[in-house]
């Protein structure tokens, strides 16, 4: 009797382990079937620290919101990196190791290649083009599909271009010691040939190209001097709790700006690569605890949806377990639970 009881207990212990192993294998196999969009680049695209309510986001951090669960966005962009330093730090090797045939690699550099530091600097027409071409070539060698993008614009309406040897320093610049210069009505380019070189490389190597510089130029110019500040980490003292002294940062995006730019680039990707159109995801609001969405709490998302009380609103939920909200029977809100997202 004791022997049978021990066998039964052992079976009850092993069954959940077998089930867990099966689920892990199934999940891994399912992930292998998905197409991945890798992103390599700088701080304008990078994932950010979201602790303490920090508002800075890269457009690559928000890109998953605009593609369904058949596409996995794997963002490797890092603050302060150029096409040279990203490669020399071994970050490209990590992307290659994960790449499988049919995956896409978005290659976007330029902001830091123009900086004078030797570990970052490259020259358009020579070393910058060489690095871009190397990423293209090695992506193809591993069965991937390269997509070249030029750099997004800086919000630069200044009558003369302010001196800027490192965009990363902008995070420690408060509003009171920020740039105090007269702004005009026209957005002024700060990238020169660094915005031209990616298109030239794309033409020479027959690579997909998205003109992120022109798209964001038209966006910021269309918004104008004041409204364009809403895209960036531009806050007056006391306006944003995470930067109590304020900030004047014309390079890096806040949550709203990252989503606006990611939406533009997702649409441009689908136009350039029609195969991606069937995976394009459209939702009014995204909530995600990892900071990829418009909001990090369900309460914030619902509050924003209720502002549009007479319009239907779709809230997509990116992963995690959530308490089901109590809503009126005739609510205007529809939820879309993405992969891994469940109600308690």
Short names for language-model regions:
Residues 10-16, 20-34:
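Bacterial Sec-dependent signal peptides at the C-terminal "C-region" and cleavage site
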Residues 56, 83-94, 319-320:
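N-terminal post-signal-peptidase region of extra-cytosolic proteins
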Residues 290-299, 309-344:
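N-terminal extracellular ligand-recognition/capping segment immediately after the signal peptide
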Residues 45-50, 83-85, 294-295:
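Short, solvent-exposed loop/turn elements at domain surfaces
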Residues 2-3, 90-255, 259, 263-270:
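Alpha-helical cap/lid subdomain in secreted, periplasmic
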Residues 1-9:
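N-terminal secretory signal peptides that target proteins for export/translocation
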Residues 30-77, 93-105:
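Serine-esterase "nucleophile elbow" of acetyl-processing enzymes
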